[in-house]
Amino acid sequence: MGRKWANIVAKKTAKDGANSKVYAKFGVEIYVAAKQGEPDPESNSALKFVLDRAKQAQVPKHVIDKAIDKAKGNTDETFVEGRYEGFGPNGSMIIVDTLTSNVNRTAANVRTAYGKNGGNMGASGSVSYLFDKKGVIVFAGDDADTVFEQLLEADVDVDDVEAEEGTITVYTAPTDLHKGIQALRDNGVEEFQVTELEMIPQSEVVLEGDDLETFEKLIDALESDDDVQKVYHNVADF
């Protein structure tokens, strides 16, 4: 699974980096975190968390600085979080998390993306009950047992620790993600490939042929919306 998370980040960065959409989305997230607290990551843990993730996604420094400078200014632009759940082809399920300054615009855009690309937007809660919210931490390593013991000693609520091909993947309770990251830093981990709150599907489906092609177009349409921050799904090996 560790390779899965690292591959997802690499794939998304490569795809979005060409048109800078990932940078713009991080810019909004950084602005919101800085605006809601101090614009200093040393005194604002939410901002520090976003900046760490931005670093993993290779967001340029000038994008980060611009977002923080904007938060320091007198702008009163506000953003609202949203979630839209729906269905793709052949049993696939999708959760879309948004951060927007115009809820009506975003809701219409997401609904259109579903409808025009082989999907259907469902009611709130129609999909999310089949996913579990977890903290995911990925870094280089191969001793899962030692990592598990270190996290337990730090009183971190750990669901699982996996080691695969030189990569460690840690799953924590969502409330203990930051605590887990700090515990690993205290034990010498300096670089992380992934530090995210994720919605993990309780089971996965395999898509092939036309279904897979339709699903890929649907995900691309959803992720291309500027207000969409995260897209979760239950399709294996995608």
Swiss-Prot record:
Biological processes per GO annotation: regulation of DNA-templated transcription
Keywords attached to this entry: Cytoplasm, DNA-binding, Transcription, Transcription regulation
Disulfide bonds: none
Chief site of localization: cytoplasm
Transcription is among the record's keywords: yes
Coiled-coil region: none
A Pfam family recorded for this sequence: TACO1_YebC_N
Signal sequence interval, chain numbering: none
Statement: the UniProt record of this protein carries the keyword Cytoplasm: yes
Name under which the protein is recorded: Probable transcriptional regulatory protein SAG1645
InterPro entries, sorted: Integrase-like_N (IPR017856), TACO1_YebC-like_2nd/3rd_dom (IPR048300), TACO1_YebC_N (IPR049083), Transcrip_reg_TACO1-like (IPR002876), Transcrip_reg_TACO1-like_dom3 (IPR026564), Transcrip_reg_TACO1_YeeN (IPR026562), YebC-like (IPR029072)
Organism of derivation: Streptococcus agalactiae serotype V (strain ATCC BAA-611 / 2603 V/R)
Molecular-function annotations in GO: DNA binding
Subcellular location: Cytoplasm
Entry's Gene Ontology cellular component terms: cytosol
